[in-house]
Swiss-Prot record:
Its biological purpose: Essential cell division protein that forms a contractile ring structure (Z ring) at the future cell division site. The regulation of the ring assembly controls the timing and the location of cell division. One of the functions of the FtsZ ring is to recruit other cell division proteins to the septum to produce a new cell wall between the dividing cells. Binds GTP and shows GTPase activity.
Official protein name in the record: Cell division protein FtsZ
Gene3D superfamilies: Tubulin/FtsZ, GTPase domain
HAMAP family named among the record's database cross-references: FtsZ (MF_00909)
Native source species: Mycoplasma pneumoniae (strain ATCC 29342 / M129 / Subtype 1) (Mycoplasmoides pneumoniae)
Keyword Ribonucleoprotein among UniProt keywords: no
Taxonomic placement: Bacteria, Bacillati, Mycoplasmatota, Mycoplasmoidales, Mycoplasmoidaceae
Binding site residues for GTP: 27-31, 119-121, 150, 189
Length: 380
């Protein structure tokens, strides 16, 4: 065990050695992990490691920033991929389990990132997740669901993959590719990278009113015993962030949270959520926050009197902010609404006759470009 000296006290305390692994599985997962290390190389430390796993050696070689790479292969497969077949992806993953055990053995928390709808991510992710769960390792999966333009076959593969994943993982987040416009999947990478970064910092950066690792485990962990009517429910999580300043007030926070389902990329409404992690960073000199008012806005949105809350509070020199993680149990892996109108479109527009497909795409394109401008500062 490692120890640190406490100044002036003459005592020693053990260091926080919680180890986190982030595995990008398949092409989409590899892309996200590589983007993450390009944008945030400081996140990789002795206790936080990133891995790219793929059946396609050619694609794996194109990743420049992730150093830990492994080919999911077995004899005759030769790193040539699986041709979009999830069954082949699962078979190769089973053959790879001994190596996966060596890669994942020392970690306390594993995040699996993949695109669903093709072969490697859809087939291998549930296999790796089940392996981790059987070992008692906390694991969260962050996966994407194909847009309609990617074809119904891809959606069928993804839906079956989600059913297998739900039986294996502790919980999962679902990103909807149909929320991207004109196939701008870089938006997906930005959103998922931010989410992973927030989770890592939630675990590794202590707060004045702290959220410890056991709090996080109890939030994400699937109960050992579930009632019969709960066994097939999908345990999905979602995340929300908001930073306050002179132009982003408590009223804007309330509006954004109320319209959360229309403005984000992750699937599922949060009404009726069972659990919430609420992390608040306070700077009262820059922008005073009323924590009670913030909580009341959240309670009104979720509308569940049995809500379990883990609250963490700390001080910051930057703009104050709120981070929320929700956990819900749903009957469906993917919410039934396909594409909804953005919240800022007027009621008059909504009441008009249904939009033609190209009109919907143009609306979504406008929404996506506004998001890119907001996130990057670039003007299109």
């Amino acid at each position: 065990m490692d120890w640190i000296q406490t100044a002036g006290a003459g005592t020693q305390l053990p260091e926080n050695n919680i180890k986190i692994a982030v595995f990008g599985i398949g092409g989409a997962g590899n892309n996200i992990i590589d983007d993450m290390l390009r944008m945030h190389p400081e996140l990789q430390t002795a206790n936080v490691q990133f891995f790219a796993l793929n059946t396609d050696l050619q694609h794996l070689k194109t990743k420049r920033y992730v150093q830990n790479k492994a080919v999911i292969q077995f004899e005759e497969s030769k790193g040539l991929g699986v041709g979009g077949d999830p069954q082949k992806g699962a078979v190769l993953a089973h053959h790879f389990l001994e190596q996966f055990h060596k890669l994942s053995d020392s970690f306390d928390f594993c995040i699996l990132v993949a695109g669903f709808g093709k072969g490697t991510g859809t087939g291998a992710t549930p296999v790796f997740s089940k392996f981790l769960s059987n070992k008692g390792v906390l694991n969260l999966s962050i996966v994407s669901y194909p847009a309609m333009c990617e074809g119904l076959k891809a959606r069928e593969k993804a839906a079956k993959g989600l059913e297998r994943l739900n039986q294996a993982t502790d919980s999962f987040m679902l990103f909807r590719n149909d929320r991207c416009t004109d196939g701008i999947y870089q938006l997906a990478n930005v959103a998922i990278v931010k989410t992973i970064k927030n989770i890592i910092e939630l675990i590794n950066l202590p707060l004045q009113q702290n959220i410890d690792f056991e709090d996080i485990r109890s939030f994400f962990k699937k109960p050992a015993q579930r009632l019969e009517n709960e066994a097939n429910l999908f345990r999905v999580t979602n995340t929300f962030t908001f930073s306050f300043d002179a132009h982003n007030t408590i009223e804007h926070f309330s509006h954004k949270l109320k319209n959360f389902e229309y403005e984000g990329f992750f699937d599922h409404k949060v009404e009726g959520a069972q659990k919430v992690i609420l992390k608040v960073l306070v700077n009262q000199g820059l922008y005073p926050l009323d924590l009670t008012q913030i909580q009341e806005i959240i309670w009104a949105k979720i509308d569940n009197h049995n809500l379990e809350v883990q609250l963490g509070v700390d001080f910051t020199d930057a703009n104050p902010s709120v981070q929320l993680f929700f956990l819900m149990e749903k009957k469906q892996a993917v919410s039934s609404d396909f594409i909804q109108k953005p919240a800022f479109i007027s009621v008059k527009e909504v009441n008009q006759k249904p939009a033609k497909p190209f009109q919907v795409l143009n609306d979504l394109k406008e929404l996506g470009l506004k998001y890119v401008k907001q996130q990057t500062g670039f003007n299109y």
